Structure formats: C-alpha cells, structure tokens
Amino acid sequence: MNIPKSVWWLVIGMALNITGASFLWPLNTIFMKEELHKSLTIAGIVLMINSFGMVVGNLLGGSLFDKLGGYKTILIGTFTCLCSTTLLNLFHGWPWYAIWLVLLGFGGGMIVPAIYAMAGAVWPNGGRQTFNAIYLAQNIGVALG
C-alpha cells in the first residue's frame, strides 16, 4: 500500500517540527546554565514545565481540530510558536525566558494532534500505516535533534 503524497507532507512536517523541538532541549539547558546562571535543576524544571505546556497544547489542539479543522489549528499553533520565539529573542532574561519557553511548548503541542488527525482524515483507509509513519517521523526527529 503506497502512502499518499499528502500524508508524506504531514510526515515530513512532523519530522521537522520534532527535530527543531528536540534540538532546543540541550541548547536551552546550556543557555539557562551559562547565560542565565541557573542551576541544572532549575533548567530541568523549566524544561519539565515546558513539557507540561506541550501536554496542555496537545489537549487544546485536539479540541481545536474538532472545532476549526486542521489547517487553522496548525496555523494557531505555529503563530503561538512564532510569537513566543520572537519574545524569547527580545526578552531573554530571567524569568521571561522560562515563561516564553513554556508558551513555545504550548504552541508546539497544539500542532501534534492536528497533524495526526489530518493524516487520519486524508487517508482513512491507511489504518495503522498512517499513524506508524508519523510516529516514526517523531522518533527520527528526536534522533536528529
């Protein structure tokens, strides 16, 4: 069974999204330790809260997909990420850095369920193959990041 081209675009998008996110984990830890002079414990707690923001974003992203559709949900998540990244560049002192990082996790979290749901909607006959491809893209993204 061949995966449709539209699903491949979603797989590529997921791989890029997760690669970028996982690339930032060690970079954020170094920045918080060396530039913001916070302990590794604090850096770990901030990244944990960032992950909680992602979970909340996942929940909201799934709900928004049901109400607005995939395109608008991904657009809202991407806009949230763009705003938080811009604010990270402008206000990168403590505690603003941690706040914008949590907002970045929230926005990124909104994108993930929308991609899964869009893939299922685009290729309903794909069954497990659709979701396995996206799951594999997430794993590749983490490995590359």
Spans of model-derived segments:
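Residue-level signature of mid-helix packing/kink "hotspots" within the transmembrane helices
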Residues: 51-59, 142-143
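Paired small-residue
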Residues: 84, 95-103
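Cytoplasmic membrane-interface "Motif A"-like loop-to-helix N-cap segments
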Residues: 67-78
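Helix-to-loop junctions at the C-terminal end of transmembrane segments
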Residues: 57-69
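Helix-loop boundary and gating motifs at the non-cytosolic
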Residues: 5-51
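C-terminal ends and interior cores of transmembrane alpha-helices
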Residues: 79-92
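Glycine-rich segments within core transmembrane alpha-helices of 12-TM secondary carriers
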Residues: 132-145
